[in-house]
């Protein structure tokens, strides 16, 4: 499996690489760690005109700092690849961060791992602008990392009977496996979560129950331990509650196809889950052969 890890040098970027090593993926991994240097984000503080005394010196110092950080990140990423026993390489590119990640992902990548936050030019933690762009513009699956890596023992799988959620189920069955764990002794437990709106239609409840039962049966045959969470309420909120209640290490959800404006649709439910989950989220777009 071709995996792209975006690492900006922040703790989230470093965690993303470690999460890839923790994922119970079946196929051998070929990992490319990407660090993007975006000199276009450089701005002199309080600059109100093109030339201000000291501006040139400041800009040169900032460029030097960016380059030094890139070198540091590349060396650290290489060392982490080796310590995690991952096969791959580290590359540095220049350009807009999100667009460069998307462009690189288009070259045969099957999974992108990105931190939910990162560092901007002033070393402030951004509110996910890069990860938000990536999940809406890459055509492959995306792992959004929110916390330090840990053994993956409990997964919440969001299902609704759509083609997108069926792809998420297939990803667990074909690309991941309960016998391919990297830490922890307990078997992986998948909570199949499905939420129905507050509508008094028995046929809807039966349909929801049928979806959960069908997915559960497939996962049981695949070797997972399975729990069920079929509830009434707002789907995104109920999935987030299930993740909290079942102490999920990871949420897995599907995504829709390509929209009319060239964005890969995530869907309102998956978007809200990615934005508000307490744990990392895997957004599945394609099932790896």
Segments predicted by a language model, with ranges:
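Small/aliphatic-rich secondary-structure junction motif
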Residues: 1-57, 84-86, 150-207, 213-229, ...
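Glycine- and acidic-residue-enriched helix-capping/strand-helix junction motifs
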Residues: 64-71, 201-209
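Short Asp/Glu-rich motifs
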Residues: 43, 100, 125, 154, ...
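Gly/Ser-rich helix-loop-strand patches that form or flank binding pockets
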Residues: 2, 17, 22, 26, ...
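Charged, low-complexity surface patches
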Residues: 70, 123, 208-209, 232, ...
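Structural beta-alpha unit
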Residues: 12, 22, 38-41, 57, ...
């Amino acid at each position: 499996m071709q995996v792209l890890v975006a690492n900006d040098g922040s703790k989230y970027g470093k965690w993303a690489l470690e999460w890839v090593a923790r994922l119970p993926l079946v196929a051998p991994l070929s990992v490319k760690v990407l660090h993007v240097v975006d000199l276009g984000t450089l701005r002199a503080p309080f600059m109100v005109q093109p030339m201000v005394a000291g501006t040139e010196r400041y800009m040169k110092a900032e460029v030097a700092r960016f380059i030094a950080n890139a070198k540091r990140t590349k060396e650290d990423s290489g060392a982490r690849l080796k310590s995690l026993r991952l096969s791959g390489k580290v590359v540095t590119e220049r350009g807009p961060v999100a667009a460069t990640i998307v462009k690189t992902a288009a070259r045969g990548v099957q999974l992108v791992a990105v931190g939910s936050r990162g560092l901007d030019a002033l070393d402030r933690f951004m509110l996910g602008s890069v990860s938000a762009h990536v999940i809406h513009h890459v055509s492959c699956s995306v792992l959004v990392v929110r916390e330090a890596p840990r053994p993956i023992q409990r997964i919440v799988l969001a299902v609704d009977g759509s083609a997108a959620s069926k792809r998420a189920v297939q990803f667990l069955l074909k690309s991941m496996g309960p016998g391919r764990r990297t830490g922890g002794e307990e078997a992986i437990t998948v909570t199949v979560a499905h939420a129905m709106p507050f509508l008094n239609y028995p046929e809807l409840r039966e349909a929801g129950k049928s979806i959960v039962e069908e997915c559960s049966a497939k996962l049981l045959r695949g070797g997972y331990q399975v729990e069920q969470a079929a509830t009434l309420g707002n789907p995104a909120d109920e999935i987030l509650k299930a993740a909290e209640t079942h102490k999920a290490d990871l949420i897995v959800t599907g995504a829709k196809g390509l929209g009319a404006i060239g964005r890969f649709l995530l869907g309102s439910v998956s978007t809200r889950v990615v934005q508000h989950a307490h744990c990392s989220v895997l957004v599945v777009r394609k099932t790896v052969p």
